[in-house]
């Protein structure tokens, strides 16, 4: 995949990338795409998948858990995975 196509993927929102990935999967499952085109869209699908995974990881990293004091009142936040 060329750099221009890769840059196009990085500019997509999560929702846009998932939508395009669903279209690619559908086209590949139908089997009505020529071999060369199948390889091309498969590679784009891989780039879209990686992009979605990166966006999900970034979102997970931003999620915080509300910390409560002994009385149950919010006291602050901490990373979701912190114990």
UniProtKB/Swiss-Prot annotation:
One of its GO terms (biological process) is DNA catabolic process. It is found in: Cytoplasm. Keywords: Cytoplasm, Exonuclease, Hydrolase, Nuclease. Its EC number is 3.1.11.6. One of its GO terms (cellular component) is cytosol. Belongs to the XseB family. Bidirectionally degrades single-stranded DNA into large acid-insoluble oligonucleotides, which are then degraded further into small acid-soluble oligonucleotides. Heterooligomer composed of large and small subunits. HAMAP family: Exonuc_7_S (MF_00337). NCBIfam families: PRK00977.1-3, xseB. This is Exodeoxyribonuclease 7 small subunit. It comes from Sinorhizobium medicae (strain WSM419).
